[in-house]
């Protein structure tokens, strides 16, 4: 059952709302504009606030839905987390878009929202504070994501291993941003 859900979650995660919305609304393909990342932050840059919000909601939803379905089917928190990670992997490496995906932060937030909502509040607060101080979305994401791990270790220990893997994936997808941050070239708002 978990494998079937994980496959379905991956396929759902492979839907790139940024790319689909850019096609539906006739705006620039985010993979070819701005930072080149098909996510909400780049959609804000290339297509405006409305499409950025829709992208964010779609990306969060595709992380949340598989976790809720797994819970509804009676799976444990670790299985829920692995199913959610499958959706994030779909976002990172989407089948439908030549495996060119986003950074996974919004989809991971949706997954985390399903697993343990207070962790999303902590991550959102850390993201907002870091962004306010730095005006850099990637830095805010890199600070916020690992901050959820101690809270999960305490409240949802079954999700700790999958969330540690997820944190590593998100850091990996931000490796170019890390290089740019250290070189002083990272984009700011």
Curated annotation (Swiss-Prot):
What's its catalytic activity? an acyl phosphate + sn-glycerol 3-phosphate = a 1-acyl-sn-glycero-3-phosphate + phosphate
Q: What is its main location?
A: membrane
Q: Name one GO biological process term.
A: phospholipid biosynthetic process
Sorted alphabetically, the keyword list is: Cell inner membrane, Cell membrane, Lipid biosynthesis, Lipid metabolism, Membrane, Phospholipid biosynthesis, Phospholipid metabolism, Transferase, Transmembrane, Transmembrane helix
Q: How does it sit in the membrane?
A: Multi-pass membrane protein
The keyword Membrane appears for this protein: yes
What InterPro entries has UniProt attached to this entry? Answer: G3P_acylTferase_PlsY (IPR003811)
UniProt-listed Pfam families: G3P_acyltransf
Q: What is its EC number?
A: 2.3.1.275
The family note in this entry says: Belongs to the PlsY family.
Q: Which PANTHER family match?
A: GLYCEROL-3-PHOSPHATE ACYLTRANSFERASE-RELATED (PTHR30309:SF0), INNER MEMBRANE PROTEIN YGIH (PTHR30309)
Provide the assembly information.
Answer: Probably interacts with PlsX.
Q: What is the recorded function of this protein according to its Swiss-Prot or TrEMBL entry?
A: Catalyzes the transfer of an acyl group from acyl-phosphate (acyl-PO(4)) to glycerol-3-phosphate (G3P) to form lysophosphatidic acid (LPA). This enzyme utilizes acyl-phosphate as fatty acyl donor, but not acyl-CoA or acyl-ACP.
In its UniProt entry, what is this protein called? Glycerol-3-phosphate acyltransferase
* Protein source organism: Pseudomonas paraeruginosa (strain DSM 24068 / PA7)
- Encoding gene (name): plsY
